[in-house]
């Protein structure tokens, strides 16, 4: 199933990779939308069975490292002053490469978007609702402080590396 964090960020950003990573809900109430589940939630499987499931199967390729990941590593290295590369260019190349790796070729609107992650609202139990943790948009801000730039890089790296998010 899709996690609450993925729902918060991907739906908030209107990120088209959501349709590559997850199947839309089959539950009649939420049909053709994307809904996640907060990790660590005690729930009845019957309540959440119709929510967004992974599109990953036993036969899905599992690359060890992708070119988008390398671009994000280069962006982080540039941000930390370890290379002479431009962190914004590396960041943008990482997002573009991730989109292309997923068969999505319209990237510019996304890269210029100031959309933010949504607060997560649990489908069945509002006691599981959580405020969005991610506080950056996809749009690069060259005036932002180093920590905000790093959060932006790491957020996109995390999205791009799905389903290996723990690696990001």
Model-derived features: positions:
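Extended ligand-binding clefts on enzyme/binding-domain cores
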Residues: 1-71, 78-168
